[in-house]
Structures are given as C-alpha cells and as structure tokens.
C-alpha cells in the first residue's frame, strides 16, 4: 500500500525552478545587484529558500494545522490552564475597525470610546475582586504577579519597613517564586498539610516581621478551596504583611466569593483563563492587577481616569507610581475581549460560569477516581489532581503514558507531574463549557487505557507523525533553526 505523505519540512519538498507565481517578462533592462547596492551589504550567496508551488505551501500548512490539537476541535482538560471555549463573538468584536484602526499616539480626545471601555473594565475587575483600584498594563499573568509584588515593595519602602521575604505554598505555580525573586524578595516555601491545604503550623512558624506578603492561590492547585484563608489574612495583617491572591483559578469563584472579602490585599487576573483571552501562541496577553486603596498610589502609571465632565484621560500624575511596566495602555485587544466577556455574561452569568466549572469537575472526578485515585478531598472546585501511582506500581502505566495515549483518542493530555506534591499527578480541569457526554467519554477512555498492554502504551501516541521526542535533549540542546544537516532533520 502506498501512502502520499507530506514531507515534514518545506525544505524537503523544494524542487529547483518550482514557483508560487510566474510573472510576465519585463521590458526594463536587467542590472546586476552590485551596480545598485554596495558589495559589503550583499550576502555572499542567495539564501537557501525552498522553491515551491502555492499548492505545496498551502497543503503543507493545512496538514500541519490538522495535526494540532485545539479547544475548537478537541476536549482539552489541561489542568491549571482553564482551556475553555472562547466565544467567537468576542473575536469578531475585537476585530472591529473602530478598535483596530486606533493608534496609541492619537490625541486623547479622539480615543474617548476606547478609554471609556478601559475605564469601565477597570471598574468591573475591581468589583469582581472586591478591591479598590486596577491597573490594566501588565502583559501576562506572570508579569501581573511581578507588578503586584513591585507595588508591594514600593509600599513598604514608603513606610520605611525592611521586608525581604515572600511566603509561598509548595503547591504554587512556578511563576510565584520566580516573580518574588525578580521583585527582590526571598521566596520561602510553606508546606501543604495532609489535606492538601496550607500547613498552618508551618505558616505560623515562618511568619515574622520580615515577611512582605503571602502568595496564595485559592482555590489551590490541587483544586481545593482553603477555608483557612481568613485566619491567614488576619495573621498577616496583624504583622503588617499583605495577602496576595494568585488569580489563576478565578474561574472557580466568579460571582460567588471575592478575593477582597477573603482578606486579599492585591491580586492578578489571567484573562486568557477566565475572560476569553486567546491561549498560547506567545502572546499578546494581559495580566491586570487589583489592589486595596492603600496600595493604589503605587500602581503603574498611567491609569484611565474619568473627569467630572464625563471625559476620559490618562492619569500620569502619580508621583508614587512604580512607573510603566508596559508601553501604551497594555494589550488592548485582549482587554477588549475580557470586557466583551464580562459584559455578555453579566453578574449572573459569571456566577453560572463558576458553578458549572465546579459541577463538571466534581462529576468527572466521581467517574475516574476509582481508576486514578484523588489523594486530596472528597469534593473539588474547578479541577482535581488524580494520581496514577497505583497504575505505575501495579502495571507499569505512568501518568505520561496515559497523557500520551489520550492523544490517540483525540483528547489532549491533562497536566502531568504537577503539582509536585502528588506522585504521578494528572491535573484535570474540564471547565464549564464541556457537556456531560464529553466527560463520560473521557472517563471511558481513561478506563480503557488503564486496561491496555503497558508495553504498547510506552510507545503512544501511535497516530501522530512523531511519537515521543527526546524532551530532555530538546530542553538541554535545542535546535532553533534549520541548517540542512542530518541532525536537524
């Protein structure tokens, strides 16, 4: 049987003389490049670009696109990432010429519509957070973390307080300690207890007058709401420290509880997880931060302000601001999508988002926990962490094998081996946009995988052009450009 396979690289499809278009002959006499461009500015030889027809190029990229997994085509239970479906109307609205044709160097008087939208978004995000002021500048969730910690640092410097430490749970996202370090703090780890919650005894032992903040994700990364958050906030405030809430899991509590009401003093949002910003692709992104009034003077300048006459302006008169963290107004395209999502859902809709996210996660957990036990909690919030430890011990089937084999069933793998406090972790987050039927199919597939021949699973996926690349080698010795040598192929 012969099968027409598309070569993996355009360079391998190249044929001399092949072209995407044939142009008519020119009646302008040809001149050598050397006669028009100084020799020192010319390359010694033409670039080795592939020679292809238009069909070759279109077919190549179409085949690549069908090899990708996406939320539009596949169930995508990638825990801690909230890979929910983003309404296409928000994409259409974000492409309106009235938005895309504007330029940040325009006079503010010609940007009143955009500034009004951004000002209203600031107010929406402040209300959802239960906090007082918002900056839209940060360009990603991680930069939002860093910005908020820089704000905290400026606040304590203004108070002449030398605070050098940030407390971080051992189940936290890796960006938390990285952001603390970049902001000039020492990251101090707080252990989890047997329930998967903050070990309060360890927290109390490490809380002192050098602590600037405690970074808590609530619900946390094992999918549990930590009811100790009120006591944690009280103890921090008694010591003059701040409670930082990582907003990565806001999808679980929208409209049900506000971080400010839990005692949080500052937080960041991830619009790509909660408010229909695009996922991945290297950006652009957004990571707005919300803070209490005492921290508001230190927010990045400018903020969008509304004057008494109803006009909007950029407020640069902020002498205690930490300064800019992003050019212009932030990534307005992503912020506009967030605005559209919040507007279209309304308060009741946002609460329903959280309710359905929690319902779906709990339903799916009950379907799979006898195959892959869930070590923490009888119930969960928006996600849960199952463990393939028993399968690995008894049958040699590891979390990675399960994740890879799911791809053969057109299901994206869950997050594996995170958080580190769960051995053979499978972090599963179905989100609110999936139907019951999808969850039940996932559970059936997981059960089938658990009964398969382990030797066959070790080579999965079997349906992809490449099964298991050497990920360690790729991380240690990445090849970032093609040069035609065999090891690059």
Language model: regions and residue ranges:
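Conserved PLP-enzyme active-site core in the AAT-like
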Residues: 113, 143-309, 396-397, 424
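Short strand-loop junctions, especially beta-strand C-caps/beta-turns
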Residues: 139, 193, 217-219, 387-391, ...
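General small-molecule cofactor/ligand-binding pocket signal
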Residues: 135, 188-190, 414
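Single, functionally critical "micro-switch" positions that shape active/binding sites
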Residues: 78, 140, 245
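A short, small-residue-rich loop immediately preceding and capping a beta-strand
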Residues: 132-138, 165-168
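Short, well-ordered loop/turn and helix-capping segments at boundaries between secondary-structure elements
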Residues: 154, 158, 182, 209, ...
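Non-catalytic terminal extensions of PLP-dependent enzymes
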Residues: 1-133, 257, 307-329, 335, ...
């Amino acid at each position: 049987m012969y099968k027409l396979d598309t070569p993996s690289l355009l360079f391998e499809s190249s044929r001399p003389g092949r072209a995407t278009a044939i142009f008519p002959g020119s009646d302008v006499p040809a001149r050598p490049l050397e006669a028009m461009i100084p020799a020192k500015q010319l390359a010694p030889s033409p670039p080795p670009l592939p020679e292809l027809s238009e069909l070759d190029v279109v077919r190549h990229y179409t085949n690549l696109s069908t090899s990708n997994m996406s939320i539009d085509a596949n169930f995508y239970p990638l825990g801690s990432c909230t890979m929910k479906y983003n309404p296409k109307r928000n994409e259409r609205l974000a492409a309106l010429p009235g938005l895309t044709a504007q330029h940040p160097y325009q006079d503010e008087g010609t940007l009143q519509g955009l500034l009004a939208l951004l000002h209203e978004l600031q107010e929406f995000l402040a209300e959802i957070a239960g906090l007082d002021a918002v900056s839209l500048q940060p360009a990603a969730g991680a930069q939002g973390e860093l910005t908020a910690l820089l704000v905290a640092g400026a606040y304590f410097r203004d108070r002449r307080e030398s605070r050098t430490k940030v407390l971080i749970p051992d189940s936290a996202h890796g960006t938390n300690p990285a952001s603390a370090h970049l902001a000039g703090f020492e990251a101090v780890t707080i252990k989890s207890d047997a329930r998967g919650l903050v070990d309060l005894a360890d927290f109390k032992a490490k809380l002192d007058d050098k602590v600037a903040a405690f970074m808590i994700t609530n619900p946390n990364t094992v999918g549990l709401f930590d009811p100790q958050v009120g006591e944690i906030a009280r103890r921090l405030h008694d010591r003059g420290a701040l409670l930082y809430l990582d907003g990565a899991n806001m999808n679980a509590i929208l409209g049900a509880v506000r971080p400010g009401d839990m005692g949080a003093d500052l937080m960041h949002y991830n619009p790509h997880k909660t408010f229909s910003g695009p996922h991945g692709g290297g950006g652009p992104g957004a990571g707005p931060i919300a803070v209490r009034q005492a921290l508001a003077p230190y927010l990045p300048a400018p903020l969008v302000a509304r004057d008494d006459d109803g006009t909007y302006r950029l407020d640069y008169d902020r002498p205690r601001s930490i300064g800019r963290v992003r050019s212009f107004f932030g990534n307005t395209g992503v912020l506009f999508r967030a605005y559209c999502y919040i507007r279209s859902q309304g308060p009741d809709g946002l609460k329903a988002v959280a309710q359905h996210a929690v319902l779906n996660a709990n339903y799916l957990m009950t379907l799979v926990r006898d195959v892959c036990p869930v070590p923490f909690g009888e119930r969960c919030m928006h996600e849960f962490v199952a463990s393939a430890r028993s399968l690995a011990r008894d049958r040699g089937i590891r979390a990675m094998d399960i994740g890879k084999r799911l791809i053969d069933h057109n299901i994206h793998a869950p997050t594996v081996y995170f958080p580190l406090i769960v051995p053979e972790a499978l972090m599963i987050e179905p989100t609110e946009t999936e139907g019951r039927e999808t969850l039940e199919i996932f559970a059936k597939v997981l059960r089938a995988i658990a009964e398969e021949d382990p030797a066959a699973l070790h080579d999965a996926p079997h349906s992809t052009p490449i099964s298991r690349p050497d990920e360690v080698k790729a991380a240690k010795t990445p090849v970032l450009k093609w040069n035609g040598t065999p090891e690059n192929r």
